[in-house]
């Protein structure tokens, strides 16, 4: 077998990238890929549904926070996700007006709300999620948009309840509050289940808790219910972190070692890239390190009521 040389790799890539014939082929393959995106997404959802049925995409809620990660099964994760959704469900009362599920994912919470007699509208910018939910949970109304871009005039004072389940962290806080005030009915409920930063950590996902608290009160929201559930989502983080440490990083190190053994010169060329990849995975593992999470963040379930 001919040895692979860096010069040959560069010539081949540039030749295929710049030659008109190959460039046209590239465009055709790109179009084919776009047409296959739907089938790929269906396959991913099917796999996820087989692993964790229920269509939930959140951390879950464990009644026993001290359960060791080695004793947690996929069934336990599934049940924890259902308990989390039921925790949110208990905060709802108004069945006369629509519920808006912001960042509805694949529709697990939508399904639970429909089963309990609520009229639900799901919001997501993802066209595949829209298609999936419309086929699997047809009673749900759907809005394909980012929350920041929702048509306020069409939904002004429309919803009796708005739910942000692990979606508020992706929306600028001032923008979210302003929109909720316009599309939520007076005396309506805004349910937020998400994690918040408790200090100035290097990792910036999640809003600052003190800032959130100050701004919602200034905006005219009363706190109807407030519950910290950090310890109850701890087992999920510990479970994911355990598998990352026991399987993810060792597998990467094994593959890099095999690559170095078979292609030492290529390994030398890509060494900095491989080191950066390892560093990237380390940082991602830190995001689900339960001890770091508890040090820097708190997970809250808070129900707010909009006053006149």
Model-derived features: where do they sit?
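N-terminal auxiliary segments of SAM/dcSAM-dependent transferases
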Residues: 2-53
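Conserved alpha-helix/loop element of class I SAM-dependent methyltransferases that forms part
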Residues: 78-96
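Conserved class I S-adenosyl-L-methionine
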Residues: 96-105
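Class I SAM-dependent methyltransferase SAM/SAH-binding core
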Residues: 106-150
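A short acidic, Gly/Pro-enriched loop at the edge of an enzyme's catalytic core
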Residues: 151-162
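A short SAM/SAH-binding and catalytic strip from SAM-dependent methyltransferases
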Residues: 161-173
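A short glycine-rich, Lys/Arg-flanked "PGG" loop and its adjoining helix->strand segment in the class I
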Residues: 175-189
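Substrate-binding/catalytic lobe of Class I Rossmann-like enzymes that use SAM or dcSAM, i.e.
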Residues: 202-291
